């Protein structure tokens, strides 16, 4: 009798029965916008077209080449010297001006964009929050019952703490695939990781993107292994010229 009951229960689609999937989606939409509103209230968003337009163009290029709906991704550039970028729920992609300044070419920045986009597309963001904060707490936040400190703590989980190694590797290698399909050389992304891993020794508190994405040298080596023997695309003169203009504008913002 008990065995029959357990068998019957095992045949139930509990995700559908309890409407958990729909609840999670609704919660993600609400808390994503809530998180961004909270973050924006304490930071300065960059709206200069000389900065936003080229970064938006890079994101659009990657999305278009990989059949990702560009319209759903909400790009935000913040005036902060730290080298950081992260994704928030509901497809918010946040990039600090300090990270753009740290990139030596467009392909490096595209690698970071691809990495964070992979976290969004693979649903890493909500999975991390549910694991570390809990779905019930997130639902409470989405219904207006979360206090400011709780919300700030959740944002910090995404902006300054690492995903596990498996998810970071998946995001890196997915970014490599995104870049190749977009006609962008992935090798500079590996070079970016190598370089910042070395610089972390001197400026650990400023390089949040590396400190929250550990094992940078190992990650770079996996990228190089992934792309070896492949015929990689080369950066065009047009891309180089556009990036030079972007860096000049960013340096003015940071000065």
Where are the regions that the model predicts?
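A Zn2+-metalloprotease active-site environment signal
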Residues: 1-255
């Amino acid at each position: 009798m008990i065995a029959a009951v357990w068998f019957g229960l095992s045949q139930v689609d509990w995700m559908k029965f309890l409407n958990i999937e729909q609840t999670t989606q609704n919660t993600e939409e609400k808390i994503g916008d809530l998180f961004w509103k909270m973050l924006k209230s304490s930071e300065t968003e960059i709206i200069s077209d000389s900065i936003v337009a080229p970064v938006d163009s890079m994101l659009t290029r990657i999305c278009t080449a990989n059949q990702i709906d560009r319209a759903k991704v909400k790009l935000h550039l913040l005036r902060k010297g730290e080298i950081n970028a992260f994704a928030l729920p509901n497809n918010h992609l946040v990039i600090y001006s300090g990270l753009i300044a740290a990139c030596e070419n467009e392909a490096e920045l595209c690698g970071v964009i691809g990495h964070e986009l992979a976290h969004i597309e693979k649903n890493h963001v909500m999975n991390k929050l549910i694991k570390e904060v809990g779905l019930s707490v997130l639902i409470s936040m989405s219904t207006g019952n979360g206090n400011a400190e709780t919300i700030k703590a959740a944002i910090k989980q995404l902006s300054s703490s690492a995903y596990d190694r498996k998810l970071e590797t998946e995001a890196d290698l997915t970014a490599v695939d995104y870049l190749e399909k977009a006609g962008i050389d992935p090798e500079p992304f590996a070079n970016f990781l190598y370089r910042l891993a070395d610089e972390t020794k001197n400026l650990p508190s400023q390089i949040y993107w590396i400190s929250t994405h550990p094992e940078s040298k190992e990650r770079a080596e996996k990228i190089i292994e992934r792309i070896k023997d492949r015929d990689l695309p080369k950066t065009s003169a047009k891309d180089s010229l556009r990036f030079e203009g972007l860096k000049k504008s960013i340096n003015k913002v940071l000065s």
